[in-house]
Regions:
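Zn-dependent metallo-beta-lactamase
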Residues: 2, 9, 16-56, 63-65
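Metallo-beta-lactamase
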Residues: 22-26, 122-185, 302-317
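Active-site neighborhood of phospho(di)ester-bond hydrolases with catalytic His/Asp-centered motifs
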Residues: 58-62, 88-100, 118-120, 199-202, ...
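Active-site HxH/HxHxD metal-binding segment of metal-dependent hydrolases
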Residues: 79-148
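Cap/insert and terminal regions of metallo-dependent hydrolase folds
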Residues: 206-311
Length: 318
């Protein structure tokens, strides 16, 4: 009897401990750029890697070198910037080919090492036809116009198909977004085993874009949130609420973000969504507008969500 009681007590104690423990972070995120315009030294780019590795994929690449230098200044990296660029960054996922998302990739390509660039077909075609075309810039890819130098392998992504990210232990799955309909942007679901991060490129709300892209995305990722496998969502908010819908240009405001989070919560439940970190990207200067966005998102909301504002060069764990 004592032996049985002892086993029961041990089970209860281990259960209490396990429920009291917070889930260990799985991913590290290093923002190389967090803004959506004006400052060419700080444009959208986020390094993601499993914790304990140097297997980074760069999600968008508006700023690369300046962001690496800032990360070194902040103590995130203790190696030369060339080591981060050439050895740590294993590939790039480009959500769309607007310059504030690809300029760092283009400018740094002569100094970069061989790796893969992932993008959906419209973004890939734009990069091949307008940037890496031997006229605007040398063709550092392995296909396209001019004489391909074959430094980068251009990998065109198909929606709903998961593929491995070369030289990492992660995978990527692309989902369509609307960035002034019919122009397409992309969301990337990055996975490591049963854990994931969701990164959204530029997107307008479904109500303005007249699509169901975001609703479809929320439905697809809801099971991951319910199982606490989705560690974070990186999503843009470009303008404060005062920006008229007619002048959103395929972007979100705090009120539109909250409407989209309501849709997501309908699939996941409020409590499950509260456990998933929401990281705000693509804030557009000037500083007064950014401050207003932060104030509007800091206001209490009926979902109980807390938003995270990344800082260039400062490492985060998810």
């Amino acid at each position: 009897m004592r032996k049985v009681f002892g086993w029961v007590l041990l089970f209860l104690m281990s259960t209490i401990v396990s429920f009291g423990q917070k889930a260990k972070p799985v991913f590290e995120v290093v923002p190389l750029g967090v803004y959506g315009g004006i400052d060419e030294r700080n444009l959208s780019a986020y390094l993601v890697a499993p914790i304990g590795t140097k297997e980074y994929v760069c999600l968008d690449a508006g700023t690369v070198h300046s962001g690496i230098e800032k990360a070194i200044e902040k103590g995130t990296f203790s190696v030369p910037s060339s080591t981060v660029l050439r050895q740590y960054i294993k590939g790039y996922c480009i959500s769309h080919a607007h310059l504030d998302h690809v300029s760092g990739l283009i400018i740094n390509s002569p100094a970069d090492s061989t790796k893969t660039v992932y993008a959906i077909a419209p973004a890939m075609k734009m990069m091949q036809n307008h940037y890496f075309n031997d006229q605007t810039w040398a063709n550092f890819g392995d296909e396209g116009l001019g004489k391909p130098l074959k430094k980068y392998h251009f990998e065109t992504l198909s929606f709903a198909k998961t593929i491995p990210i070369s030289n990492t232990s992660m995978t990527v799955q692309a989902f369509p977004l609307s960035h002034v309909n019919p122009y397409e942007s992309t969301a990337f679901l990055i996975k490591k085993d049963n854990n994931a991060i969701l990164y959204l490129g530029d997107t307008g709300p479904d109500s303005v874009e007249k699509t169901t892209n975001l609703a479809d995305l929320w439905k697809a990722i809801a099971p991951l949130i319910q199982k606490q496998e989705l560690k974070g969502i990186l999503i843009e908010v470009s303008f404060p609420n005062e920006q008229p819908d007619a002048f959103l240009f395929g972007h979100l405001t705090p009120k539109h973000l909250m409407k989209e989070m309501q849709v997501l919560a309908a699939f996941t439940g409020k409590e499950a969504l509260q456990k998933c970190k929401i990281i705000i990207t693509h804030l557009k200067p000037p500083a007064a507008a950014i401050q207003k966005i932060k104030q509007q998102l800091a206001a209490p909301n009926d979902l109980g969500l807390t938003f995270v504002f990344p800082e260039q060069g400062v490492r985060m764990e998810l």
